[in-house]
From Swiss-Prot:
GO terms for biological process: translation. It comes from Staphylococcus saprophyticus subsp. saprophyticus (strain ATCC 15305 / DSM 20229 / NCIMB 8711 / NCTC 7292 / S-41). The keyword Ribosomal protein applies. SUPFAM superfamilies: L35p-like (SSF143034). Residues 1-49 are annotated as: Disordered. Belongs to the bacterial ribosomal protein bL35 family. It comes from the Bacteria. HAMAP family: Ribosomal_bL35. The keyword Ribosomal protein applies. This is Large ribosomal subunit protein bL35. GO terms for cellular component: cytosolic large ribosomal subunit. Keywords: Ribonucleoprotein, Ribosomal protein. GO terms for molecular function: structural constituent of ribosome. Residues 1-26 have a biased composition (Basic residues).
Amino acid sequence: MPKMKTHRGAAKRVKRTGSGKLKRSRAFTSHLFANKSTKQKRKLRKASLVSKSDMKRVKQLLAYKK
């Protein structure tokens, strides 16, 4: 079986924290801000963790990323 490769798109979007969790940025932050409340925009600035249900799949995409 061939070697697994790191998914480059996922590698650019996700960082691993010190404890091994995966940190990601939030969606809905590129445009159309006039329709979003100030509170919503403020909450979108904060990074978030990859959910437990997606963790296995995302870790597989980032097989060799430190």
